[in-house]
Amino acid sequence: MAQVKNLMKNFSQQRETILSAVRNTRCHPRAEWVHNKVKETMPNVSLGTVYRNLGVLAENGRINAIQIEGATHYDGVTEMHQHFYCTACETIYDIELSNKTFVSKVEQKTKHHITESLVMMKGICELCQTQKTKENQC
């Protein structure tokens, strides 16, 4: 019984460490980045464990999973906001503009009740426009 409790505690510690890694970065990392970050404090954690826990955290609304260009990125900011994806450097930026007016207009026009708004804009970021670089932060 003590072994089971210890195992569950370990899973909880792993999940909290994974959650912390996602929430404490401004980038929108993929599972491999999270795995490398978590390994700094938990060297024995497997990539499979990170994938499973990211899935559980996303399913429970503790983080958001963002699908773009065939890859899943994770976002620790769960409040409604928009994203901008730079097609040159493949960086995802948070856009923190109020979308209440937009949501309100859509609700008025359609008579739907909107509970979540997912907006992904694509283009070339300011840095890439000036530097023509292909480096992303995650």
Enumerate the language-model features and the residues they cover:
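Short amphipathic alpha-helical elements of helix-turn-helix/winged-helix folds
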Residues: 20-25, 37
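Short alpha-helical segments that sit at the start of domains
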Residues: 1-20
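Basic amphipathic alpha-helical segments that dock to polyanions
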Residues: 50-60
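Short coil turns linking two alpha-helices in DNA-binding domains
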Residues: 46-47
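DNA-recognition alpha helix
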Residues: 30-43
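Non-DNA-binding regulatory cores of transcription-related proteins
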Residues: 62-64, 68-138
